[in-house]
A protein has these predicted regions:
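Glycine-rich phosphate-binding loop of ATP-dependent small-molecule kinases
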Residues: 1-122
Length: 122
């Protein structure tokens, strides 16, 4: 499967989350299968992060959504463990503060979006 086409949001396009399958599972049904795939691709992730940083033109925002204890922290640790932590940031968002609630919905996210060559995980 070509994941870059399935999950990529093209700049300027409109996203309809009701059309996204939130229960998507790939052929790797077991935890052990998934860990094997992660290990296989860790070096490539590391190399691609370095190239993106060196190019300095693009950034990557990864949005993980799930309830408490859904495995978001484990996903970050396993999948992004090969990346250079100096080029990554992880931000969790809880209930908006009074200041955040006084602004538009996306105001609190803008400050945490990644700069060129950087990776951010929400």
């Amino acid at each position: 499967m070509n994941y870059s086409k399935r999950f990529r949001v093209v700049p300027g396009s409109k996203v309809d989350l009701s059309k996204v399958d939130a229960g998507f599972k790939d052929k790797h049904e077991t935890h052990q299968d998934a860990l094997g795939v992660i290990e296989t691709h860790n070096r490539k992730l590391h190399d691609l992060q370095y190239l993106m940083y060196a190019e300095g033109k693009r950034s990557l925002l990864i949005v993980l959504q799930g309830r408490d204890a859904a495995g978001k922290d484990g996903t970050i640790n396993h999948v992004l463990g090969a990346m250079n932590p100096q080029g990554c940031s992880v931000t969790g968002f809880k209930v908006p503060s009074k200041e955040e609630a006084a602004h538009d919905f996306l105001w609190r996210y803008h400050h945490h979006t990644p700069g060129k060559g950087q990776v951010a995980i929400f």
